[in-house]
Amino acid sequence: MAVPAAPNLQLNTARQSSPVNSTENDIHIDERELENITNHVEDGTSLPLHSPWTFWLDRSLPGTTAAECESNLKKIYTVHTVQSFWSVYNNIPPVSCLPLRCSYHLMRGERRPLWEEESNAKGGVWKMKVPKESTLAVWKELLLATIGEQFTDYCASEDEVVGVSVSVREREDVVQVWNGNASFANEANVLGRIYELLPQISFKAVFYKPHEEHHAFEGGRSRH
């Protein structure tokens, strides 16, 4: 499924505000504002997605406990159509504006981007570092590939991509593609599809890791 280009849907510029305040000390999500924006674009011509997808925002600091990670996790919005996806994407700060160690996630349904969630515990991620000047393009391309189900033919028939994340780091940013079952990762060619979509990008430190292999899987940080 190819996702149509973004419509021109932006916040009222007279408001001088955004649904998300990306200051380092307080990242606030105005869910009501996003609700108003998405409702404005939904009509009988909306193009439904194959499944709903939920945007999440969080900030992960070294030494953070599982409970703290969970409490720092903020749901932004669940999108059901191409139009609602673009209305959210266009009206939250670009990843380049997020503070250090903040992350955006887009997860299938309303599953949370936590390793130990029942729906995620058997899965894992393809993880790679991205040059900062390429992060915006990579994140957008992966989002579109994900909601367009472009990884379906590159996963094992018993598996699927269930999310994608981008995390702001000091030198290079990190992107991750989540799948539902780590035991089928060797049968997948998700990385091959990413390289096809982004042939101009020089990814670094590319690898796959099951969630259960993280040292913090049972008691420390419950996410990347």
From Swiss-Prot:
InterPro entries, alphabetized: TIF_eIF4e-like, TIF_eIF_4E
Q: List cellular component terms (GO).
A: eukaryotic translation initiation factor 4F complex
Q: Enumerate the residues binding mRNA.
A: W115, E116, R169, E170, R171, E172, D173, V174
GO-annotated molecular function: RNA 7-methylguanosine cap binding; translation initiation factor activity
Q: Which UniProt keywords apply?
A: Initiation factor, Protein biosynthesis, RNA-binding, Translation regulation
Q: Which GO terms describe its biological process?
A: regulation of translation; translational initiation
Q: Name one Pfam family in it.
A: IF4E
Q: Where is this region: Disordered?
A: 1-23
Spell out the Polar residues composition-biased ranges: 9-23
The entry assigns this protein to a family as follows: Belongs to the eukaryotic initiation factor 4E family.
SUBUNIT field: eIF4F is a multi-subunit complex, the composition of which varies with external and internal environmental conditions. It is composed of at least eIF4A, eIF4E and eIF4G.
Q: What does this protein do?
A: Recognizes and binds the 7-methylguanosine-containing mRNA cap during an early step in the initiation of protein synthesis.
Q: What is this protein called?
A: Eukaryotic translation initiation factor 4E type 3
| Encoding gene, per UniProt annotation | eif4e3
